[in-house]
UniProtKB/Swiss-Prot annotation:
Binds 2 [4Fe-4S] clusters per subunit. GO terms for biological process: aerobic respiration. The keyword Iron-sulfur applies. This is NADH-quinone oxidoreductase subunit I 2. It comes from Rhodopseudomonas palustris (strain BisB18). The gene is nuoI2. Its EC number is 7.1.1.-. [4Fe-4S] cluster 2 binds at residues 61, 90, 93, 96.
Amino acid sequence: MIGWLEALLRVGRKLAAKTVTVQYPEVKPQLPPRSRGRIVLTRDPDGQERCVACNLCAVACPVGCIDLSKAVAEDGRWYPEHFRINFARCIFCGYCEEACPTAAIQLTPDFELSEWRRDALVYDKKDLLIAGEGKVRGYRYWSVAGKAITGKDKGDAEHEAPPVDLKGLRP
């Protein structure tokens, strides 16, 4: 008898408690600031695409959903000739964003990616490329790439071995 009464009281307390279900289409959920959603390709402050087709994002992807091929522009700069992401396979882990040296590939909080057909979840470069800079503002990869930092020659840092003289190592 007491067990039955305890169960009835427990049900009564749960009925009086506030519900936690969010009515999704009408009420948008509050997402954490670092939530990982849709992947985008960004541009630098000059309006050029940041991606240099280094293929690091495709190598870092644990499920292999990124496919790209490199092309060379007239000025010698690499750019992706085609860039595809299969969102049907993507697990939104963020490894591609971490691997990108130019901050070109970024994950946004947008999570509404449902489609009726799976082939519609394969996004091309034109679908991924956005007009803005994304989360990383003012970063110009080409202004810093390949340039030596002044005062940072080999052997100048604290607790660093002096440079090796290769010609002095002859037998």
